[in-house]
């Protein structure tokens, strides 16, 4: 299970995130449960309020939801600012949660 990896990541984040830093994260959610992603969201938000800057590549609708974040989307070779609700990660997650059985029926039917 990935809990050992997520514990290591959490400890590193707690010990290594400082105000006024610049941080580059590439899919930090990969080893994190949704609960750990929420913890990371709180840590990032707290440091950002103190002046730290973050560039995060993510597909996580949780991390995309960091308050006051500028979200850049990559569509058809174009990079542009977009709203949280307009991200593919949000839309697919919302569709799955709100229409799980219908979506599964469509996807899993021959």
Positions of PLM-derived features:
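C-terminal lobe/lid and adjacent interdomain/linker elements of RecA-like ASCE P-loop ATPase modules
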Residues: 35-53, 60-110
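Walker B catalytic acidic pair
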Residues: 26-28
């Amino acid at each position: 299970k990935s809990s050992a990896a997520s514990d290591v990541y959490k400890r590193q984040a707690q010990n290594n995130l400082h105000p006024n830093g610049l941080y580059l994260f590439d899919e930090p959610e990969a080893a994190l449960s949704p609960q750990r992603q929420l913890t990371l969201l709180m840590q990032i938000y707290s440091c950002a309020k103190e002046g730290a800057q973050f560039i995060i590549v993510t597909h996580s609708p949780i991390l995309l939801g960091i308050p006051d974040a500028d979200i850049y989307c990559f569509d058809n070779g174009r990079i542009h600012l977009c709203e949280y609700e307009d991200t593919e990660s949000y839309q697919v997650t919302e569709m799955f949660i709100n229409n799980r059985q219908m979506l599964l029926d469509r996807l899993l039917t021959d």
